[in-house]
Amino acid sequence: MLKKVVYCGVCSLPPEYCEFTGKIRRCKVWLHEHDQELFAQLYGDDKEDVDGVAARLGQSSIGEEREEQLEKKLQKLQAREESKEQRELARKLSSRVVIRREARTKRKCMVVVAGLEVFEIDMKKLAKTFASKFATGCSVSKNVEKKEEVVVQGDIADEVEAYIHALLEEKGMKGVKVEQIDAAKKKKKTPTTTTPPPS
Amino acid sequence: MFKKFSKEDIHTRTKVKTSVQRSLKSKLVEQFPKLEEVIDELLPKKTELQIIKCSDKIQLYAVGDEVLFFQKFEELIPTLRFVHKYPEAFPTIQIDRGAIKFVLSGANIMCPGLTSSGAALPEAPGLAQDSIVVVNAENKENALAIGKLLMSTEDIKSINKGHGVETIHHLGDCLWNFSLV
C-alpha cells in the first residue's frame, strides 16, 4: 500500500530533482551505482555519459526559450556548486587536527583535541564516545578563540590520536594531518637527567 | 517556515500519551479523509509517538527518528517524507517546470506558475483558501513542497497574479535535512 521512495545519497532529494541541486554529476554516479533501473528511467540508457544533459528529465511545456534559460541557470548553479565543493575539500585537506597534552595537577594531565569542527563531526557525540571508550571524563568546551574542542581527562593522547585517524579515514579524509603537541612535562624522564647516576 | 531550523530550536521532547495519540490520529483522518485506510500502517498502535516542541510554537511529531508531521497552529501538516509514502491522500496542485527551481529554494508560488500549460489545479469547485496542499511538479512523480493556499484555487485561475501558495516546507530545507539523532 505504502510507496517507497528512493532518496539520492548525495543530495538526499528524490532522484528526479537531482538536476536542480547543482550536484547532478555526483548524483548520477550515485544513482547508477545504487539503482540501475531508476537510472535508466530518468537518464536514458547510455550508461557512460555522466555529463550529458538529462534528456528525459527535460520534457516540458514551458517553451524552448524559457527552457534554454533554465538550463543555463542550472548549469551556472552546477558550476558554482562544484567550485564550492572543491574549495570545501581543499579547506578540509589543508586544515589539521591538533592533539595537545596539557598538565593538570601533579602527575595528572588532560588531552585537548582541537580543529575538528571543519570535518562536520558531532563534537558532543565524540566526547561521549571518548568518555565511554576510555572510561574517563570528557567534554566539549570553547577555547580562547571561541572554537569548540574536545577535552579528555587522562594521559591518553596516543589512543585518542589512533581513534581520530580511524575516524578521519572513515570519512575519506586520510590525508589530513594530525599533530600531537606535548604541553606537559613528562615526569618520568626528568629524574634520569637531574639525579646523578649511581655509581 | 523552516528556512532556519536546527537542533538548537528544540525545547522539549516527550512521549505522547496513547490517548492523545489516538485523538491525533483521528484528527489526521479528519483532515485528510483518504488517510483512513493506511493510517494504521503509517502509525501503528504500538508505536511510540514523540512530540517535539520547538521555538516559534512549532511542534513536530516523530516516530523513531523520523518526523511525520508538524503543527504550527491548528492544522496538522504532513512532512514530505510522509507525503511520499502515500501521496494519494492529499490535495495536490502541480506547478510547471520553470517554477521548480524557485520553489526548491523556498520561494512562494506565484499564480502564473500554477496556471500555465505544464501546471494543473483541481477542477471546480477546487480548494478553499488556507487549505494545506501538496505541491507536485510537471513530469515528476514525487511532491516537492507543502504549501498553504493564499487564495482559493478558483481565484488563482481567475486573478492569475501574485502569490498563490505560501511554501511551508520544501525539499532540501532545514526540516527535510533535520535528523533527531
Curated annotation (Swiss-Prot), chain A:
Q: Which molecular function terms from Gene Ontology are attached?
A: translation initiation factor activity
Q: Which UniProt keywords apply?
A: Cytoplasm, Ribonucleoprotein, Ribosomal protein
Q: Which residues form the SUI1 domain?
A: 97-168
Where is this protein localized, as stated in its record?
A: Cytoplasm
Family matches, as Pfam families: DENR_N, SUI1
Name the GO terms of the biological process aspect. Answer: formation of translation preinitiation complex; nuclear-transcribed mRNA catabolic process, nonsense-mediated decay; ribosome disassembly; translation reinitiation
Q: Mostly located where? A: cytoplasm
**CDD domains, alphabetized:** DENR_C
| Subunit architecture | Interacts with the 40S ribosomal subunit.
As for family, the record states: Belongs to the DENR family.
Query: Regarding domains, what does the record say?
Result: The SUI1 domain may be involved in RNA binding.
Entry protein name: Translation machinery-associated protein 22
Q: Which organism is it from?
A: Eremothecium gossypii (strain ATCC 10895 / CBS 109.51 / FGSC 9923 / NRRL Y-1056)
Read off the lineage from the record: Eukaryota, Fungi, Dikarya, Ascomycota, Saccharomycotina
Curated annotation (Swiss-Prot), chain B:
Outline what the protein does: Involved in translation.
Looking up SUPFAM superfamilies in the UniProt record yields:
PUA domain-like (SSF88697)
| Annotated organism of origin | Eremothecium gossypii (strain ATCC 10895 / CBS 109.51 / FGSC 9923 / NRRL Y-1056) (Yeast)
Question: Could you tell me which Gene3D superfamilies the record lists for this protein?
Answer: 3.10.400.20
Protein name as it appears in the record: Translation machinery-associated protein 20
Cited InterPro entries: MCT-1/Tma20, Pre-PUA, PUA, PUA-like_sf, Uncharacterised_CHP00451
Entry keywords, A to Z? Cytoplasm, Protein biosynthesis, RNA-binding
Family designation? Belongs to the TMA20 family.
Gene Ontology CC terms, in alphabetical order: cytosol
State how it assembles: Associates with ribosomal complexes.
